[in-house]
Amino acid sequence: MLPRGYSKCGPWLCGLLGALSIAGPCVADASAVGSTNVTVADPTVPRPPGTPCVVTLFSGDSFVDFSDHPYSYAPPGGCGTHWAKVVLEADFSVTAGRQFDRTAQLWLGGVNLYYGTTQEPSSTVSPSWHVERDLTDYSALLRQAGTGRAVLGNVVNGTYTGVIHGSARLLFYPASLRAPGALTPDSVLPLGSDAVGNATLLDTSDSPLSKTLTLPTNIDRAYLDVIAQSQSSDEFWYTCVPDSYAAEVQECGGGNFREAEVSIDGQPAGVAPVYPWIYTGGIDPYLWRPTPGVQTLNFMPYRVDLTPFAGLLSDGNPHTVAVNVAGANHYFLASATLLLYQDPHLRRVRGGLLRNTLAGQAPTPTIGDTLATDTDGNVSGAITTRLSRHYVIAGYAITSHGRVDSTVDQTVAFTDTQSFTIDASTYRQVTDQLTSVDGVSRHRIGRHLVAEYHERLRYPLHVDYSFDPTSDGGYVMATQVHQGYTNDIRREFAGRTLYAAHVSNTVDAGDTLDFDGSFNVTGHNGQQNAQSFAFRDSLGGCYRTDVASTDGVVTDEATGVGCPDGQNHVYWFTRPDGSPVSGSALLGW
């Protein structure tokens, strides 16, 4: 029997689900209340029934410098080559002391397997944390032996003493009657130039991550997984202002619009929104102890649908696929992986592009302001940045199913308001930013609409920052942050909804830092942090976990609130963590 809350499905889907098991109630381990260690509300990757084969990538490595950490990989024996699910598990820790947050990446054959950052330690807390990623869609890569590396640069000396340790493994769940083999891409190809793998530095808007490829000639669907991480001068891009305002409001220049642009042979092919990740040393390190910001430890790639280009990419000629970050201002690191589904019954798919209204729509935002400076030099008002683009990209491919017409219809919008109050006793800046994506991918065979994939994505960010003098000659810096991530997806087949899901992840954090007259930190107060992660789907799956902390100690943890029987409960083949899915109407398992 399906769980309560199940919504109506078609006969084919209901029949399939009747033969599948569900992941048992996701009950949390021992309560984290009272802990100072890393505590997050994020779900782990749900698992199918069966015993996995485990392949260790590396174990107990110490990261003390920027040296290479290579590893060799071979597919597991005893689990076949067509798996129900593949999961990456990684564990990290850093010794107590002083250390910056660091970027962590795992690679295999040039393909990124994991991307995130590390938790900063304190003088008394040695944090440890666990991350997981669903790599089932990368099964084609994992069927071949290869070489990979862990990239986690660190500095350990008399000042920065924190040593980072890490281990990682892959778990392969064999296909069975209860857990059928997943329908996965036939080719998994990196865009980076490093054959083993590393992120590509994009210094300006014109810096590309690109590769020229001669691809299989029978592509019927294509996607690109994109991660774009801000670094250096761009770390706090979400608070920056256009250059012409930077001196007046005492902020970083370069503007605050960032967006990844995907192109094929120089022609715009899609857009990947950039998430405003805040690292654990960001703004005020106490904000993120013990709960970091949204996805800080485990970035989720954004999947761009390139299926309208399938016919063009199958023509046997070399094609250049590229990613640029619009607005990059020294600098972003980027990773991109091309996923190709191939027609098993044809050696050659023919087709072409029919329409592309993204071409000619440059990613150039509109800037406005209400700033005013009075006779005393006090500044007040706001700077606004706006961009919204609606586009349609359509193409066709002659496949073994007949002619398939594919359309991506998408609106991508960015709004940002930077509000300032600056006078002799106050510097206050309030950031309100929202990145949104509303899109649908459609596939038709003849006159029949056979598949639709809808997505509604939101990245809200609010930062309220003030820096004020105190009566004793010192200063206080008060910060409040709200980060959010919501994603609603819906798959339809022949006009009927097969599956729908909602993911929500929010973090709210606040703290006040105290400084002496020489700007040395002398203490902090009022630290609070709360994270809420929720997932629901049309099959009755439900996940909800909330954690809260005060002064760096977990004060509350609740699981299953609002779920049937007060228990977290999801199907093993779903993706409650918000990891990307391919927009196939026949579901991705």
What name fits each language-model region?
Residues 203, 207-209, 232-240:
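A short secondary-structure junction signal
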Residues 78-87, 215-223, 234:
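Extended extracellular/luminal ectodomain segments enriched in beta-structured repeat modules
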Residues 182-206, 213, 346-414:
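Compositionally biased low-complexity segments at domain edges in trafficked proteins
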Residues 12-24:
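Bacterial N-terminal signal peptides
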Residues 205, 216, 254:
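Short, contiguous, pocket-lining structural segments
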Residues 29-70, 74-80, 91-187, 197, ...:
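Beta-strand-rich ligand-recognition modules
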Residues 2-14:
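Bacterial N-terminal signal peptides that target proteins for export
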